[in-house]
Every structure is written in C-alpha cells, then in structure tokens.
Amino acid sequence: MNETVTVRVQKVRKNRIRIRLTLFLILAAALLLVAIFADKIVPYGPYAQDLSKSLLPPSAEHWMGTDRYGRDMFSRVVVGAQTSIFSTLALVGVISVFGTAVGTLCGYYGGAMDSVVMRISDVCLAFPGLVFALAIAAMLGGGVGNAVLALAVISWPKYARVARSQTLALKSSGFVAAARLSGDSSMQMILRHILPNILGPILVTAMLDIGTMMMELAGLSFLNLGAQPPTAEWGNMMSGGRSMLQTYPWLVLSPGFAIFLSVVIFNLLGDTVRDYMDPKNSRAR
C-alpha cells in the first residue's frame, strides 16, 4: 500500500515537472523566435534616427518610447535580442564543449596533464569571475567577440570539473572495463561509453549557466567593454540611458526588463531540466 502511494506521488511530481518543462521550453522557444525574426517584426528600423522625436515617452506610436536620437526603443530592444541571446548561447556552447573535452581527457588519462589543468582551473575559480573577465576585456578592448572571449577564458573550468568527476566515476565501471577487454581503444571508449553518459550533467550545467552568462555579458557591455554604440544590445542600451535614468527612465527600464525576463525564463528552464533529469524522479517516467 505504501509503495503504491509512493509511486503515485512520484508520478504526480513527474507530471508537474513535465508541464513546467513544456511551458518553459515554449517560452524559451518564443524568445529565440523573436530574436531570429526580429528584423521582420519591428515597426521601425533600430538605427533609424529622427531628432524631432527625441526622448518621447512610451505611447501607442512608440510602445517603449524613443532615445536621445529619436530611435524607437521597442525596435531596438527586440533587435537587441539577437546580439544578447545569440552571443550568450554561443558563449555557453563554446565553454561547455571545451570544458567537457578537457575535463573528460583529464579524468580518463590523469597524470601530469590532469594536475596542470586542475591547477589552472583552481586559479580561474579563485578569482571572482566578473572581475577576472573585466581585466581580460579591458586588455582586449571593446566588442561583443572580445567580451565573449573574456568570459570564456574564466568560465570553462566548471564544465571541466563536472566532466572530470563523472569520467573518474565511469572509468572504473564494469561496462567500461568490458569495452577495454573487447579491444576498444581509449578514444573509442571515451566517445562511445563515457561522453554519452556525462552529457546529462553537462546539459544541466549549461542550461543553468545561460542566465548567468547573459547577465555577465550585459554587465561588460554596460561598462563599455562589450557591445559598442550604436549596436542594439541590452547592456549597451542600459549604459546609454543611465545618465538620464531619473528623467527618462524608459531608456534603462526597457532593456533592463528584457534582460530580467530572459534570465528568469532560462533560469527556470534550467531548474526544471535539472529536476527532470534527477535520478530520484527516474522511476516515475
């Protein structure tokens, strides 16, 4: 009887997680579609200037008002999703692939390479990430590409550590030992038996990392170390309006709300993916 109740509770919990996962996947897909088709859905050109309409408040004609050059803020926020979201996804993709590859090789082969890489990752993790990224971005100069590179340099160790710990656990497992006895090479064992089994934790880490990386990229742009004017990018737009926050608050609030909404959606999606892949819920699938 107790086992039946437990199974029912697990199924109810799993169904709720599935509903949440579907909802947040739809919301994330909607954000991506807006970014992809931004140029086709905006009412005005994001870089079209009209000084006669400078600093207009939100209205039926300009839903989020205009900036100091008369550019429509709604159009710039929507088009800014392309730079803000795609650069974030590119960053997370690069650091997850690189970190996973490095961590897997270190965990499998060990030795001097493992010691050196882990010491490098310790150094990267010892500093506050954004402070380290600020120093690197300042040396590289402004630009979205340089901001992505600066954050990539200090963000890959978390993936390397996850991949390394998972690889160490799998390396001594029975099915890997059987594959070794069957004559598989080291690279075959990594590609066929280890990587497929560590992708789950890596995926969860990457999903949870999207919101953080988006805020850090926006932070670098806000400090003029990322996207440069007149690029429509959320952090850069907030930087351009900060001096007029008290008199023309929509200049900061509009891109700020876009960042807030995107980060919340991706964070909740990451949390839900983590819950869905939790082994405690596997029996109810």
Per-region residue spans from a language model:
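Transmembrane alpha-helix signature in integral membrane proteins
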Residues: 73-108, 262
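Glycine-rich helix-loop "coupling/hinge" segments at transmembrane-helix boundaries
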Residues: 137-139, 151, 166-167, 215-258, ...
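Transmembrane alpha-helices
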Residues: 82-98, 127, 133, 187-219, ...
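Generic hydrophobic transmembrane alpha-helix motif, especially the helices
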Residues: 63, 67, 97-99, 107-169, ...
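Hydrophobic alpha-helical transmembrane segments of membrane transport/permease proteins
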Residues: 26, 30-69, 223-231
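Transmembrane alpha-helical segments of polytopic membrane transport and secretion proteins
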Residues: 1-29, 268-285
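C-terminal transmembrane helix and the adjacent membrane-cytosol boundary/short C-terminal tail
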Residues: 154, 200-210, 249-285
